Amino acid sequence: MPLSEPRQIKKPRLSLSCIVCRRRKVRCGREQPECANCVRMKENCVYRTMVRDESTGRVRPVSPQDKDSRVSTSDARPDLPWPHWGRDTNAPYPDKPSRPPSRPQVSANASPSPQRQEPYPTVPSWEEAIQLPSYRDANAPQINGSSTTTRDPSPAPSTSLFPTPSDHPCRDYLSIRRGGRVRYVGQTFWGFVAGKESLSDDFFDENRHAHPDLPLPHISSMGMFNLLRSLPTKPVSDTLLETFFLAVWPLVPLLHPPSLQADYDEFWEWCRNSENALPSDKLRDDPTLICLLFAVLYCGASAAPAATWANTNLQGLQKETTVSHLKSAYTTSLSLCQHQEHPTLNTLVSNLLTGPFLDRPFEPMRSLVNVSTTVRIAQTMGLHREGAWSALSSVDREIRRRVWWHIVWLDVQSSISTGLTPCCGNEALDAVGMVGTDHVEPSNIPAGLSPPNELVTNRQSVAMLYAIGRFQTARLQARIVAHLQSAHDPSQDGFGELITDSKELLQKIDSLIARVPTQGIPEMGYIPSRLANASPSTQPLLYKDDPSQPTVFSAWTRIMLTLLKSEMAILLQKPFLPPPDSANPQSLKSWTSMAQLCVNYLRIYLQLYQAPAFSPYAWFCCSHYGPLQCVFITLMYLHYFQHSGETTLARYCVDEVIHHCVAQYQAPDPSSTRTSPDDTDSNGGKLRMPLAIQVLVDLHERLDSSLGPEDRAPPLDLIECQARFSMSHLATKASDLRATSDQPSSDVSSTTRTHHNCETPPITTGAPPVAAGNKPVPPNSVFVAGSDSGLDMDFLATISDLEAWSSSLILESDNLLARPDDMTPDHAVITRLGSQSTASGRRGLPDGLDFPG
């Protein structure tokens, strides 16, 4: 038998097909950037660059070391949003063929092997970012290979089609999968079988056959990493992140600051060593971290006051251009990772943070759709069922609580703006615990990536005190709205229980206010000038979340917590207001009680934009319906009860709020991010005024036209008012009430002869408070005939108790006189015309509210 010829050894071919076609074992057309098969199948087409090893003849993926130069890709890359950054030596993608010189110092956690490091790192290309570790040497460096998440990276899908019986069933099944995906599967789902819960995942995701070392098919990894070219430079990003922590996070603490800071530092550390290291496990496991990064920078740029843009790192940048490009990059990142189909906590938090800056204010139907979608997304992630979170860390559970209650708060705001029932049912209000007051810390932040000390100390947080007050108020408001909008008439027992719960809530809010450090009494309009005139660019320490000393943020927090109390009372009392009728004394009393609440609310609200120090927080209140509701009720009161008495303070508050709202739309706002055609009118590109504000403006003009020249109040003479501050005509009603008491005051009786121009004191940070001692007593019954209102007399008694309780919420200056030590005499109080000493303690305080009793 002849000997066979020697077998010829052939070199393996280089595969030029895309990964999807090779996995499906079909012929690939090799079209760039996407092959025809992937386009037809709607798959994300990904090509893996291969190279032949000359020494072994084997084919392996291309490593960064195999590249001759990264500069060759610069010609093919798209234009940068900031062209001048491309010409800067510190830019993420400099146009120069060589990199900047290395730095002499190397951070403690940086890899020692790279020979070159740059002062401001560049963002690596997509090919470098998705390289598999198969070609790497065992000693090759990897920046912080251990994940910095508060839990281990999501496990890969089980390779077993049928899970073993050892997988114990759970009533609420929470599936934690790759890519940060978390899905809640309820027992009513048609594909749910007890003990086989993991099978339910396959009905929702198409990633069963995805390679565990490759990016998830639903995420356009190439687009995500190419999008990093839109990042600002490291110094610019640092400044925007700092602004985010100053102006955004304290108001919506939906992130864990130490984890965010660690992820941010780790990301830029990888950029600095991208030629020799892979991205962190966290970024590779969940690329949606890029969405969160863009969202944080976008929020920081949008909320930054004008003074912030004078920062050295931001010089030469225009806010409008920077915000626009960051907004585009952020929205693109959400699209590339298919947020609504495959949500993660990163994308959900990003959506919540950017909502106030992306959405136009006072668009109820848009808000309705956005909020309802957000609620459903949160429910698919199991945020409404805390019982299923046992596999998560304590930090993850705390953040999920914050996110859920913030969504409940948004749902309540949307419900009030549309008059519809909330999307979150009452059962969801008891299934998630309330957030804690202290910072919570992760256990596995790398040693070299620790955030600033003020972010890592276990301590009480003023931001969390406000969050707790807001979330607890939202929980009760959701119950009240659901009860009032029920198909059945409100019952006395049910409504009485809500009133009792409201009283308990206000006691809790008072306890929260007492825990906030204070100087002066900000919620009553007395703010020290060093706080009222502060600026974050010159006095950043006054804006820190510091519970040990008075700060600008603590003053803002006390004001906002006080407004929550008034909002609760207005929500309870407003549905039972009778039709306005000046001839009906009971209607007059009921409307006067409500008008007092509204004017008191507006007087406090005016401080939020009249004090310059609060400018970083102005974005938070720009879309709230509370001020508009109070303006509307006050306008109705002024229109139908014109001859009921002096109403100068009410007119002043309404005029100021209307003027402030209209001023926002009088001229194009260079810092506005809402630049779509629907957001502007045809008159010179001005921002289109929302319909709600336009209606209030029309009512305000109609009120002026209905008054005769003799009835219109002349302009306020603030200088003379300030000189006669102690003789303000605001004491008129208090003097009338005290005349019926055993000890009438002779001082306040003289105020009836005060000049008309001095009926309102200066109110730059809010008019001084309503007098306390003898406040107007609400009527014993709001309605004359119970049959006319459809309510029985017992229920009317409950409403009467509600009015009496609501009247007690009006801030009282007599309480201030009883506590002169609360005022700091060596600090000034801001007024419209400047600082005014409060050393006299009792001098210059009003005695009453200018409303008929």
UniProtKB/Swiss-Prot annotation:
Q: Which Pfam families match?
A: Fungal_trans, Zn_clus
Species in which this protein is naturally found: Penicillium terrestre
Q: Where is the composition biased (Polar residues)?
A: 104-116, 141-163, 738-752
GO cellular component term, pick one: nucleus
Q: Which CDD domains match?
A: fungal_TF_MHR (cd12148), GAL4 (cd00067)
| Alphabetical keyword list | DNA-binding, Metal-binding, Nucleus, Transcription, Transcription regulation, Zinc
Tell me where it resides: Nucleus
* Single Gene Ontology BP annotation: DNA-templated transcription
UniProt-listed PROSITE patterns? ZN2_CY6_FUNGAL_1 (PS00463), ZN2_CY6_FUNGAL_2 (PS50048)
The further comment given in this record reads:
The macrophorins cluster contains a single gene insertion (encoding for the terpene cyclase macJ) compared with the yanuthone cluster that produces the linear compound yanuthone.
**Lineage of source species:** Eukaryota, Fungi, Dikarya, Ascomycota, Pezizomycotina
What protein name does the entry list? Transcription factor macR
